[in-house]
Structure formats: C-alpha cells, structure tokens
Amino acid sequence: MTKEEKYMHDAGAWECEQRSPHHIYSVGEHTKAVVKYCIDHGAGVELIKAAWLHDAGKMKTKKFDGKYDHFKNHPEVSAQIAEELGESEYVIRLVRFHDAALGRSDVTVQELASYGRKWCDDLAILLMGDLAGQHPTYQIGEKLQQRGIFLQALYRTLEELESIS
C-alpha cells in the first residue's frame, strides 16, 4: 500500500459518504475508481499519487446542509495534505487543479498550459477519471460537455505556447 493510499484509509475515506446528486460512492470508493481509470489510461507514478490524493481534503471540509454534503475548498485542502505528505510540486498542482474545468476563478487556462504538455495530459486523464468515478448518469451531459470545452481551450492554449517557444 502506498503512503497516499494509506493516508486515505487512515483519514476515513471509505466511511466518508458523499450525499449529492453526482456521487453514489464514498470518497474512498470514488478515489479507487479514479485511480483505476488513471492506471487504465497509462498513468505514471505521479498521476497515480495525485489520483489517490485529489479528494483527500473532503474528510476535513465536509458540511451537510440537511439535504446534501458539500466539500467547499476541498482541492486546496487536498493540495495542502499532498504537500504535508512530501509530494512533488507536480503532484500538488494536479491535486490543486483537479476541478479546474468547473469554472474556477483563481487559475487561468494560460497558467495551466504553462505547466507543459505532460502535465496537461495528466490533468486531462485525472479530470476524466474524476468524472468516471461519479454517478453514472452524471457522467453524461453538462459535466462531460463542460470538461470537453475546458480541455479544448487548454490544448488550444498549450499549442499556442508551444508554437512560440
């Protein structure tokens, strides 16, 4: 068991339910599905570490509103956990921006593209793995379209940056 997987077990990820329209799995079950997706799509060691830790902050940020669970700011808390575990900046960045396709205002496509093609490829796999680990009916429609539009913009910007250098 890797230190990342051990952290998730010790933090209670398998007991942490996600009551929402887009999740039917606990944080741990969802994470395991994301890791599997990433491995199935050629993930290297760093992407696998990021897949294990992308939702590590959910156990610390979980709030229930009487109907649904919310995990506000969990990517940043997850990135802090990755940093505390001694992960590379590459992994920490993947964890921090794993939800970048959801219209975050604190990062631009230009900034993400500046991290290079390999990092963008890993982010794309993580984004799609994160979606694949959610409720099956949530994987289609708006969320998939939203991620597709984001990835098109990311790769268009990456190609522009690569043509300059």
What are these regions (language model features)?
Residues 37-139:
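Divalent metal-dependent catalytic cores for phosphoryl transfer on phosphate-bearing substrates
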Residues 24, 110-112, 143:
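Short, polar loop/linker segments at the starts of domains and inter-domain junctions
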